[in-house]
Amino acid sequence: MPDVLDASPYDALLLLSFGGPEGPDDVVPFLENVTRGRGIPKERLKEVGQHYFLFGGVSPINDQNRALLDALRKDFAEHGLDLPVYWGNRNWAPYLTDTLREMVGDGRRRILVLATSAYASYSGCRQYRENLADALAALESEGLELPKIDKLRHYFNHPGFVEPMVDGVVRSLAELPAEVRDGAHIAFCTHSIPTSAADGSGPVEEHGDGGAYVRQHLDVARLIADAVRERTGVDHPWQLVYQSRSGAPHIPWLEPDICDHLEERQAAGVPAVVMAPIGFVSDHMEVLYDLDTEATAKAEELGLPVRRSATVGADPRFAAAVRDLVLERAGDERGQEVTPCALGTLGASHNLCPVGCCPARAPRPAAAGADSPYA
């Protein structure tokens, strides 16, 4: 039997994710949830939903999250961590409010949250904290006893997140034809966001020049590129690029776009490209459509050999990293001296999001941070 690990004062872990449709009839209602309050016509949502309809109306994120749940529960059981794991989403079933209600009914009073976003940004962190505040407000209106909720820190530079991506890039390089392999360029891909949102990401002292969002991605890209060089003996050129832009064309977003980048690399004589989706925990629709479908078609049009490396997904090392993050935060809550595990130059991220971190355009209550209205 494994030694019993102590997660106290926490009595549950909540996997908090974006959500996605499970069939064609779910696509438009799901997109209505995503775009709530923006007044987008249903016909326009049907056009946007074509990405999902190409895959039978099913988002891959749901099965990815189910696999991650299984991996977490397996890892926790094998290592003596008695901590039940629940799952709730922002935009589709299982909805966050329903899951929190279930957790309260099960007697959970101290909850840790793992968001399926590794980096600092409004949509990847604070918006989830706003969702938590909304859910707590709903439970409060029902007269339920509210649990205390904390959120695990950003884990972009934890070895259990970085090392599986290194393996993925090395495998993708090996899949390229031998004659182009050593000259291959690595395009580290992440979700584009408005430059104003990037500049405001992270704590106030990190605002500007892309903010924490860009700096964290660059740190991970360097870590992976350095590790790939050590593994292969080849110093592959690389660049951080962006994908999945949306919104009004006059609003500046982070660039270059992956398809534009492929055109530029081909024109510069690059013989092959590996696309490494470091901004995504698992194979979201943005990975399957924007990279595997759209960007891959662009590469074929250009005659440019291209491979897409694997996301972390339910890799056992990532499940072990989550266990490590849980124990780290639990020890810190108990007042113990804890040494956080982090690679790169930026160090471990904060446990508690400070006031002014990743601000919204219109201020809203956000739980699990220094500015939380819930104790």
From Swiss-Prot:
Top enzyme class: lyase
GO molecular function: ferrochelatase activity; metal ion binding
Keywords: Cytoplasm, Heme biosynthesis, Iron, Lyase, Metal-binding, Porphyrin biosynthesis
Reaction equations catalysed: Fe-coproporphyrin III + 2 H(+) = coproporphyrin III + Fe(2+)
EC number assigned by the record: 4.99.1.9
Stored Gene3D superfamilies: 3.40.50.1400
Residues bound to Fe-coproporphyrin III: S59, Y128
Coiled coil (residue ranges): none
CDD domains: Ferrochelatase_C (cd00419), Ferrochelatase_N (cd03411)
Subcellular location: Cytoplasm
Record pathway: Porphyrin-containing compound metabolism; protoheme biosynthesis
GO CC entries: cytoplasm
GO BP annotations, alphabetical order: heme biosynthetic process
Binding site for Fe(2+): H191, E286
Keyword field contains Amino-acid biosynthesis: no
Family to which this protein belongs: Belongs to the ferrochelatase family.
HAMAP family: Ferrochelatase (MF_00323)
Role of this protein: Involved in coproporphyrin-dependent heme b biosynthesis. Catalyzes the insertion of ferrous iron into coproporphyrin III to form Fe-coproporphyrin III.
Designated name of the protein: Coproporphyrin III ferrochelatase
Native species: Streptomyces coelicolor (strain ATCC BAA-471 / A3(2) / M145)
